[in-house]
């Protein structure tokens, strides 16, 4: 089957004045006269205006099937920039719903979105889940050992003076890391290793990093209360016991935060000022080869991406699932 798949995204901030009309004319001309005749047009939504309108008109003129691939709702994205009460959002919603109903077929990325389309839009959609690239897969023990040996020099040095995962092992030790040690040919997990939590961020104001810091402090306080520890107890004694191999009922947490962005230094300073005993943070930038290995080596993934509709599945979570990593995220109506 010969398909033409249209996935071009237009900037929502540009939907003013005559721009959508100009885009509509150019897109319609392109689809009608420049594209060799396919069997169907598949258009990714959003954007909805003018894309859905242009593709629907082109499919009608060329007598081709018109299929919409729903990844989110365009009117909810527009509402983030102009406000949900704006009349432009209502108009956009009408166009999106009306032309979505004209499709010969619909695909969507979650069952929650499928239910929303069926109940409130009158659209029957087939769920086609997003899939991660093949290199997002579980990490073998040997790959984990090599990865953490490479990262050892970063993991052993805290953002502050010292923390609960500051290790005595050498940064160049190729047989031992915070999590594993090698004895002869056997790779063994350390019994008192920290639990590894991974989150990626662009360090921008639209990503709420504060919530992760608050959760870390809450965990630290909760564990101290459950173990009936005195708040004034010297953390140095605790860390010395941990370095000596002592095991506790509740694990230490090591958060590795990956990514680059404008607010990185701001939050690194906040991390340095955290008064926690069982939680540590490391910030780093990983290569495209190392990031999937880290996901496959972690115990938990955290995604702080917020969705305008709450119905689409973030690709960060898809990547984590591909690596076999359980994930927690912010207020999604996940129904798989």
Where are these regions (language model features)?
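A short, charged, and often flexible helix/loop element on the N-terminal side
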Residues: 13-29, 81-88
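An aromatic- and histidine-rich active-site surface loop
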Residues: 24, 38-63, 68-76
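Membrane-proximal helix-turn-helix segments that form the acceptor-binding/catalytic region
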Residues: 50-53, 57-61, 68, 86-106, ...
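Helix-loop-beta element that forms the nucleotide-linked donor phosphate-binding surface
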Residues: 101-102, 107-108, 113-170
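Conserved donor-binding/catalytic core segment of Leloir-type glycosyltransferases
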Residues: 157-171, 179-180, 186-207, 212-218, ...
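A conserved mid-protein helix/loop that constitutes part of the nucleotide-sugar donor-binding site
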Residues: 202-244, 262-265
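Nucleotide-sugar-dependent
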Residues: 207, 285-321, 326-336
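Nucleotide-activated donor-binding/catalytic signature segment of Leloir-type glycosyltransferases, i.e.
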Residues: 234-259, 264-293
